[in-house]
Amino acid sequence: MRSENTALAARMPAQVDDLLAEVDTPALVIDLDRFERNLVAMTEAVRGNGVRLRPHAKSHKCPEIAKRQIAHGAIGICCQKVGEAEAFVAAGISDVLVTNEIVGAHKLARLAALARSAAIGVLVDDPGNVAELAAAVAHARSTLEVLVEIDVGAHRCGVAPGRSALELARAVASHAGAGLRFGGLHAYQGAAQHLRRPSERRAAIARAVECARDTRVLIESAGIACPTVTGAGTGTFVLERDSGVYTELQPGSYVFMDADYGRNELNSSDPVFAQSLYVWTTVMSAPAGDRAIVDAGLKAFSVDSGLPLVADRPELECTKASDEHGVLRVPSGAKNLRVGDKIRLVPGHCDPTVNLHDWLVGVRKGRVECVWPVSARGALL
């Protein structure tokens, strides 16, 4: 393990006090001023509205960022995998909701063991999984908070709202003396986050709110307390915040933003979060006046939401990418790029882009202020 850590440190793209121009490429760079403004903007957007903030750490996978979110008022974090939860708990995060169904004896044993060290929550949408969780916590002598996931329109995981959710809540509550605690409902409408028009997002979240409200009423009318309704993302959290139904919000991308979120239309009253995350690259080849090649490709940025944008030269276009190359088109009349020039790219999707990097380089006023490990990257298990 020591040799692995030494090798990882040797791949650090920068050291504190380096100039930005000295940061090795490709690297993932954070504009710290913008990042910190985003933290404050989310705190102000949530404060005084009777809801809790539990940011989704799948976006950054970085304990240093999670600690800053908690310092700005978050009650804890969300993550998606047991391995991610383990990384955050090891770094001192004490309240983690795994917003996923966890299946398989080995993963369940790890999750139950982790719950001896921190407050851990998890989702279910299957009665058999409830029984497996109960067996795991009994063996580990721990306690898990369990939320029933309902499908509110994303058509991914989740039982149907209504009676199916009630039956699952009853199954969880039946194990109350054996280490499972029913925590409420998980009602995340992920598909709504990137609907471009505000009216589309409002309609999608209105349906989600109705599903969550009716299901909570049904569960509570059966004598089961339903203290939490959690969900929301960066694209819609204002709607869930104002719904009177959601008690907890899970935005994640707001700390960084990305090109795809930048395509969303906003209402004039919506909070504005600044682009703070960039892929820092170097022009490695300029074989023709209309074309330049940078040293960042598919192994440095995700393209599931489109190719990256060029931050400081909007007239340039990233036209394609291969494993280690990004191709930029230089239009006629634009200033040519030269070998060695540095370029900032805005990734199409921040979450999977972060997962490609070992380090986040924090920069302020052109100088490296911090280098943070992406401790939960690659935690697929």
Task: Pin down the residues of each PLM region.
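A charged N-terminal "starter" segment
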Residues: 1-113, 377-381
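Glycine-rich tight-turn/loop motif centered on a GG-T
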Residues: 20-32, 95-98, 112-122, 196-206, ...
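Conserved, mostly hydrophobic/aromatic
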Residues: 35, 58, 88, 148, ...
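Alpha-helix-loop-beta-strand connector modules within alpha/beta enzyme cores
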Residues: 42-48, 62-63, 98-103, 125, ...
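Active-site-proximal beta-alpha core segment in soluble small-molecule metabolic enzymes
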Residues: 56-195
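Active-site loop/helix belt of alpha/beta enzymes
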Residues: 145, 151-266
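Active-site loop ensemble at the mouth of alpha/beta enzyme cores that anchors a bound cofactor
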Residues: 201-203, 236-314
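C-terminal accessory subdomain/extension
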Residues: 287-381
